[in-house]
Amino acid sequence: MTDVEAIVQRYYGDRPVLQRIEDALRAAGVDPEKPSHRDLWPFDQLHSRGIAATREHAERARIQPGMHVLEIGCGLGGASRYLAAECGCRVAAIDLTPKFVEVARIARKAAAMKRMIRTRRV
């Protein structure tokens, strides 16, 4: 593990991310086993300006159905799910943080997007 990876793991790795998301979904009246990609927006857009920024980037990149997109630093996979669902593209998503990749995979499966998104830890 490099120094950068160790710093990222220390900062992000020990938080009970999945449990917090499941609790928040239940509180919002959403079944955590079957959320839509939109149900996850309040929790999975970890970058500044959230879903608005994701939309703007997708529009500026002119992402079209059938395209293949690489998301580097996917976090919980929110932008990947947005791009796959709203733009109709396939996404390869990568991140350094094992727990984020785990949550991204669980959310991808729960939102029935497993065939459209491949998520890996690098």
Segments (PLM) and residue ranges:
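N-terminal auxiliary segments of SAM/dcSAM-dependent transferases
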Residues: 1-28
